[in-house]
Amino acid sequence: MTKISQIVLVAGAALSVAAPALAQNPDQSRAYSAELAADAQTRSSLLAPAASGSNGFTISDQSGNYKLTIGGTVQFRYTLDTRSDGVQGTGPGATNINKDDSLSTGFSNSITRIHFGGNIINPDMTFKVSALINGSTQNVTNAAGAAIGTTNNGFVLEDAYGQYKFDNGFSVKWGQFKLPTIREEIVGDEYSLAAGTSTINTLFSPGRTQGIELGYTAESFRAMFDFSDGMRSANTDYTNGAEADYAMSARGEFKIAGDWSRFNDFTSFRNQDFAALVGAGIHWEQGGNTNDGFNGTNATFGNETFLYSIDGALEGSGWNAFAAFTGSNADGDQRNSISTYSLLLQGGVFVTENCELFARYEGIFADSEVTGVGAGNELDPSDFHFVTIGSNYYILPDSHAAKITADAVISVNENAGLQNLVQSTSANNKFGAGVPNTNNGVLGDGDSGEIAFRLQFQLLF
């Protein structure tokens, strides 16, 4: 067979196969096109980015009953902290910071986080797992030359919970999650107005716990009630002495205007209407009477802790305002009852479509006997004041997905005493010390005028 004959034979075979398709009527052609489009839509949804660009990538079946979302946070920061030379010593008036450490500068990955979420069986059965990739070091030493803080590297489990929403507005959550007492902690660092959460949040935040939460959401009201292992008890076993014997938390919120999603952050973009929210949260726990022997250091003394917070938010077209009053009382078998209070005021306004200016005030009013009783033990000063001013530049308008933040945290008075503000003379304290704090850049100063400059780039994916 010649080459020309072969070509003719192949062409004829191709025409015979294509002839039925060419002979299709218009209805058959439209049906076939619709089938192809449906198949393409199903395949493209397997790895589709969320519309906002900051809610992760989603893998889903066609029904939507099984869905997996993968996302994360990367915050890269440059910090410059300037302060007076440290005051040697370990008492309430000392900084516990090396005398030569009047200037600290450098880069850090302030937050690197990855999270998985979605639903199984149906959209009402949801789950979330998140982990923090931790690799930070606090290069601060006390008078004896010992390092303050520890170096941790690796994955740290944060959230690990399941949740089911009922048709009547109720929901139940179980696992490891944030306690709902303080709104700033609920919102988190990624959606904070400044480069990070406040010193107040560092002191009072109940953090994550393991437990059960019952929730209810209506048109203008929602509430949460938790029974848990207590504040800051994430990643502990039931035999751990650091856990509370029992703990209960509750939070209620009234939405005056706007949608609930408006209060997932503190910012209000120019294309958003007026919104207002009033909320209050409480937490109470009793500990130290069980698990003693498994962790003798943490379960040596009985203790009772009460935490409460009242907050309000106003948001408009391109502006926002927020206020919160937070207080606590810590009482124990072998320590005094200590009460501490705080006030946070903050607000922001957009000056362009992408640029937002903001300011924040923090006042912390501590019990003067927080470090003990008697002459020389009183905390002086017992009030601490901070002012933060800065700007956010949203690379993608109306989205936190790519954001540059520049701010300065100014200590109005000396703040070295914040390192003693642990509200306890025993190891079972549940509150954090205010300094040194690499999140807000404040390392502690025996004089007024410490300033921490922060320049941060954020990516959410």
Task: Set out the residue ranges of the language-model regions.
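Residue-level signal for beta-strand positions within conserved beta-sheet cores that form or flank
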Residues: 19, 68, 170, 400-402
